Amino acid sequence: MAQKPNFLKKLISAGLVTASTATIVASFAGSAMGAAIQQNRTTNGVATTVDGVGFDQTVALANVAVAPNAVITANANNGINLNTPAGSFNGLFLSNANNLAVTVSEDTTLGFINNAANNANRFNLTLDAGKTLTITGQGITNVQSAATHNAQNIVAKFNGGAAIANNDLSGLGTIDFGAAASTLVFDLANPTTQKAPLILADNALIVNGANGTLNVTNGFIQVSDKSFATVKAINIGDGQGFMFNTNATNANALNLQAGGTTINFNGTDGTGRLVLLSKNGAATDFNVTGSLGGNLKGIIELNTVAINGQLIANAGPANAVIGTNNGAGRAAGFVVSVDNGKAATIDGQVYAKDMVIQSANANGQVNFRHIVDVGIDGTTAFKTAASIVAITQNSNFGTTDFGNLAAQVTVPDTMTLTGNFTGDANNPGNTAGVITFAANGTLASASADANVAVTNNITAIEASGVGVVQLSGTHTAELRLGNAGSVFKLADGTVINGKVNQTVLVGGVLAAGAITLDGSATITGDIGNGGGGAALQSITLANDATKTLTLGGANIISANGGTINFQANGGTIKLTSTQNNIVVDCDLAIATDQTGVVDASSLTNAQTLTISGTIGIIGANNTTLGQFNIGSSKTTLNGGNVAINELVIGNNGSVQFAHNTYLITRTTNAAGQGKIIFNPVVNNNTTLAAGTNLGSAANPLAEINFGSKGARADTVLNVGEGVNLYATNITTTDANVGSFVFNAGGKNIVSGTVGGQQGNKFNTVALDNGTTVKFLGNATFNGNTTIAANSTLQISGNYTADFIASADGTGIVEFVNTGPINVTLNKQAVPVNALKQITVSGPGNVVVNEIGNAGNYHGAMTDTIAFENSSLGAVLFLPSGIPFNDAGNTIPLTIKSTVGNETAEGFSVPSVIVSGVDSVIADGQVIGDQNNIVGLGLGSDNGIIVNATTLYAGIGTINNNQGTVTLSGGVPNTPGTVYGLGTGIGASKFKQVTFTTDYNNLGNIIATNTTINDGVTVTTGGIAAGGIAGTDFDGKITLGSVNGNANVRFADGIFSNSTSMIVTTKANNGTVTYLGNAFVGNIGDSDTPVASVRFTGSNNGAGLKGNIYSQVIDFGTYNLGIVNSNVILGGSTTAINGKIDLLTNTLTFAGGTSTWGNNTSIETTLTLANGNIGHIVIAEGAQVNATTTGTTTINVQDNANANFSGTQTYTLIQGGARFNGTLGGPNFTVTGSNRFVNYGLIRAANQDYVITRTNNAENIVTNDITNSPFGGAPGVGQNVTTFVNATNTAAYNNLLLAKNSADSANFVGTIVTDTSAAITNAQLDVAKDIQAQLGNRLGALRYLGTPEMVGSEAGAIPAAVAAGDEAVDNVAYGIWAKPFYTDAHQSKKGGLAGYKAKTTGIVIGLDTLANNNLMIGAAIGITKTDIKHQDYKKGDKTDVNGFSFSLYGAQQFVENFFAQGSAIFSLNQVKNKSQRYFFDANGNMSKQIAAGNYDNMTFGGNLTVGYDYNAMQGVLVTPMAGLSYLKSSDENYKETGTTVANKQVNSKFSDRTDLIVGAKVAGGTMNITDFAVYPEVHAFVVHKVTGRLSKTQSVLDGQVTPCISQPDRTAKTSYNLGLSASIRSDAKMEYGIGYDAQIASKYTAHQGTLKVRVNF
């Protein structure tokens, strides 16, 4: 795998730098293995040089150079000159008690420098100008020491055979860089580390450092003398280190980079390390001129583990001491190492890419006196043990890792700490860093990525003093507040994954500080850990309605009086903990009414949410929380008054109110969800402030509950003005506990079932101060209901109480129920205080019951009942024992109404029902009024005596055949007035009604027996207050108490039941008069007829439902309807002068003489069921005189079927011999309702009069068709005859329901005509179009010519080609396509309906030359034809989809003659939709579609001969003549889609032979740009020689003789005119365009074509 380029650079650099070291190591290894002999050379001369002088000599006493890799033992007290170019020696060994000078006069590599033999002395090194000494520190093993040889190659053990360790520089003294530049390199063969560096002792000094360069290329070098700081340049390689642990330059400080010296970091990675060790009693501080590190290189460490120390910028703290303040100028790293009780102070700006703070033991202190900035992608790591870091200026720690150390960063007032801080606080038992702000300050992210947390799993962020600490981004840390004036300010989007004020500050305490928000924020942990200083003073939300504070903790605790503040624009608090109960122990302060949201929507039903503080303000100016969403939690509001604009309760959620005052403007909940609990915990009452709405009409709460009273006497709800309670159930936990107090005025609503659940009743209800309270549901109370100070209790459901009373007599009970309800009260031992009034305002009935036996006093009392608002038709049932004349008071009962009596259904009244007591209604007693009639009723078998002259009431009974009414209110000349007796036919009847005086009863009489005393006249039925109070009569009226001389008069519109009876106590006495329209029951009987029955109205009618026996019956000019099956008229004389409508019934004249006036007519009805007809019977002993009648009409309502033949007869008058007069023409005419029947009247042999009925359908239908658009259709007359003679078809029977001639003609006409001729002609036209396309193709081929045809055989054809042109159709074969569109219109001709046909199609062909004179080809055609039929077939549509196959060819003869022809075979799929009609039972006509789908086959051919004549240059005339034959055949099919008019269609073939004569004229070639254009015009005459269209036969189901289709009436001769142009660009491609017109009598067609051909 290829290495990265920077890796290669490192590899090359390391190889070059360590080449000499590798040589030494390799030589030593080789010596040890016998590959070479290592020398040990000793000095013995004055001048000692490694080239041989001054060293031990050979056997011949000759000097010999010191071999490479040899060890040098200094025995003589003489200096040594290392003058071997690129010399390399294993080491120097001092075996002389003197300091020896070593001169490096050539570049030299040296291993160890040892003074073990004379440790008081050193080698002092001097480097010549430009020379480099490389020290590798390579040691020597004991094996190697024992095997070294001298110059004589004799073993001379080095160091007595003892080893010298690697990196032993104990013999190193001064290093003198001389008067010119030279270099010292530490390139350790066995590199040291920072933990175990190569330490240069105090005797290792630098002389002339200003001329020196010190390179550390391998290993860590620690120096002990300040002189090393004087080296002009110290260069530290990647991964290597240089460490200062020295005496001081001045005082206790070491000056670095003074006088132009520099410390540099070589290499590409910048990982070289400079370590500054504060030394006790020596250099504790480091004064730096300029800055250390840079260009992202160099790691600088300040180590004060031993003693407090400082890193000081000589230019002042406002200057960089580490790196520079731009990205490229930063040091690679900065490390600060401290220990417990020790401090490191950096008095200058720090710019490093990576920073490490480490403490050997906990509580080491690091002080940054100015900016610390690790840059955009820099890092800070806390290691080893916890340390304390104090910054003084804005600082950037970058990505900071606290690990699991309890480290602390302190930030002074107004400063910003930037970074992304990570710890390991999630690891149990670990801590992970604290950031402490002294006062104001900001903690900011160092990352541009908002998803990177600012703090992650650190221990805490602390605000320890007065001031605002600004936070943004995401934090996983605890927030701690150490002063009452401490504030955390959270920017928009801040997330705190941790708690607030749970743990004391580092070195401090918790205090009730505050949190403020600039936008949305999240705090996931608890806030405050109980009372005292750990609780928060306040949380202030952002002043923005769109911002949210999300709280995930279970405890939000504030100090006493602490608040969550919603500013003017609100904001949202969202509670999200779903695992624990939640306590919010603080007030919610609202700045602006109806703003702010508390969102606990995510809470579950397993959680309890407690708000232990006030919410908003209830007062003169309410300030409500905009919305509180409790989710599904159990929420308790128990810490003070609560003002909420909208309380949102999730499914199964509940809210508990305590002893405070609550304003809930509205609740939002799903219907039947949510629960409110009143549970006062300090006293026994809860107060709902004015304007509170719990639940709503659309979405009631599931339950409102009154909690257990506990040790208290009751649980009381004080209800303010305008408070409304909506719940499915309003319950009480304890039986007989829970009282409502409504005393604030205004209106209140209580909706839902109140009490009764599990048998638990509520206690009491109290109304006062003019309050109106509406209970919309059932309510059950054990105690009393009291109403005072003009208050009103509105009841809409069942209501149970001990009693209902008004101490001051001003209380009102108002029933507003829409359905029936029961009010249940207890009987009382003493009287209760009377109500001012009972009002009925709803349409539902009210039953007031009383139970118990405590006494005989009623549970509610009043002297006034009022019907108001929507109570029309309502009924109030009073408790048993309360009469109309006495309600327990000194004055009679007043019954008032303001609701009138008009309804959409007619007259109606509100009613009061009494039972168990008789009543007397006195004259003057207020009951109803003229415009507001009321109803009085009996609920038991008691009586009512009416003494009022005018009673604005109707009277009824609840139980059938119970109750008596005596009407005695009339006075002489002034009849009494009552508004009805009974509620209508079918309702309960009174047992007895008695009229003792004259009366106008402006309503019904519904009584088993009604007696009109002798001499009394009663008029019944009529009009009251603009509406009909009732006109029904059911039961029996007895005229007279003894003598029968009473009179009854029925007002207009009386409706008598068929079982009703009017009888007289004495025969031939008593009169019955009808003043208007009437339905008449039975009057008198054959033994005791009444004196007279007269009908005195004008232009009225009477429906006779019973028999009439009267001395005189005078119908006046009434029209009579016989509405019972057999009505008998018996009496001495009967007068009729109007219409007698018999329907299907029998009218019998039983006796006496009946006279018919000149307006008399008869109507009768013929029924289909039994063939009966209404008729008249003149019994023996009776006679009818009709001698004075004028022309009288007999009309038959014919409901029988007209599907019959011949003539039917029906008896109209039986006993005709007793009919005196002429019945028949000219005095009588007979008409009937069935237009297909002729009616007549004849007299039978027995003199009875008989109606005749003759079928006339054929004539009627024929006439209907003749006068319709179908009348001119050829052959339609015969088809109509065929249709009407097929009387057994469903279509024929359906026709007989037609109401008029137009419907009849349309129904029949669409069946007996068809479109087969049009469809066949259209299909043949399409086949001819395809043949024409083939003919045009053949003509174009001959005209354009080919080389094969040029010559004598081609005749005149080439003459049409312009001079110089070549024939272009010079290929053997080609393929072509011709799309075309045809629009044809055939007008109505010869009576045959026209059509419009539009055809789109394409013909695709392939042709070739069979030989020089014969061309043949084949083609397929695809077509679609849409036919819309016209005239009397308008609305019919046909679609034809065709596919054809054709063969075509042309033969060239001699002398310019030719023949051409084609054969075609096509298959067509036809979809035909024809209109039909259908009549329902009432003769209403609807349109239906008969669909016919079938296949058609068409085939044929044509042959044409012609002659080409060259009329002139460029013009070719071709006369032509020929024949064409086509044959078409349809398959048989059955229509679908109609109810009665589907036809079976059978077809035969159609064919035609046409003679074709015409000519074509071809013009010369026209060259247009690169195209050759060949024009052509033609004209042909096509004449039909022979052929016929199929006579299609069609039958309906059940029809035997078929209908025949209309013959073809289209023109035989047509004319074709056309023109075309062929266009060629080359021999391969040909294009064309053409137009043709077809013209015939009443027919035109236009066709357009395109052409494309590809020649091969």
UniProtKB/Swiss-Prot annotation:
SUPFAM superfamilies: Autotransporter. Disulfide bonds: none annotated. Pfam families: Autotransporter (PF03797), rOmpB_passenger (PF12334). The keyword Membrane applies. Residues 1368-1656 form the Autotransporter domain. Keywords: Cell outer membrane, Membrane, Periplasm, Secreted, Transmembrane, Transmembrane beta strand, Virulence. Residues 1339-1363 form a propeptide. One of its GO terms (cellular component) is periplasmic space. The keyword Membrane applies. It comes from the Bacteria. InterPro entries: Autotransporte_beta, Autotransporte_beta_dom_sf, OM_autotransptr_brl_dom, OmpB_passenger_Rickettsia, OmpB_ricketsia. The 120 kDa surface-exposed protein is a major structural protein which may play a role as a rickettsial virulence factor and/or immunogen during infection. The 32 kDa beta peptide may serve as a membrane anchor. Belongs to the rickettsiae OmpA/OmpB family. This is Outer membrane protein B. It comes from Rickettsia japonica (strain ATCC VR-1363 / YH).
